[in-house]
C-alpha cells in the first residue's frame, strides 16, 4: 500500500483516502 500522511488526503487515484498512514479505497473507518 502507498504511504501517506493525514486523513482524507488525496492519493494518486480518486476515491482513495489516507487511512492509518496508507491509501485505501472509499472512506476511512
Curated annotation (Swiss-Prot):
What GO molecular functions are on record for this protein? Answer: calcium channel regulator activity; ion channel inhibitor activity; toxin activity
Where would you find this protein in the cell? Answer: Secreted
Disulfide partners: 4-19, 11-23, 18-28
Q: Which residues form the propeptide?
A: 1-3
Q: What does this protein do?
A: Omega-conotoxins act at presynaptic membranes, they bind and block voltage-gated calcium channels (Cav). This toxin blocks channels of the N-type as well as other types.
Query: Which keywords does this Swiss-Prot/TrEMBL entry list?
Result: Amidation, Calcium channel impairing toxin, Disulfide bond, Ion channel impairing toxin, Knottin, Neurotoxin, Presynaptic neurotoxin, Secreted, Toxin, Voltage-gated calcium channel impairing toxin
This protein's GO CC annotations? extracellular region; host cell presynaptic membrane
Q: How does the record comment on the protein's domains? A: The presence of a 'disulfide through disulfide knot' structurally defines this protein as a knottin.
Cysteine amide modification sites are: 28
Please report which protein family the annotation says this sequence is part of.
Belongs to the conotoxin O1 superfamily.
Tissues where the protein occurs: Expressed by the venom duct.
Species this protein is from? Conus magus
Q: What is the protein's name according to its record?
A: Omega-conotoxin MVIID
Amino acid at each position: 500500500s502507498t504511504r501517506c500522511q493525514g486523513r482524507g488526503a488525496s492519493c494518486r487515484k480518486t476515491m482513495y483516502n489516507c487511512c492509518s498512514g496508507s491509501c485505501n479505497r472509499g472512506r476511512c473507518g
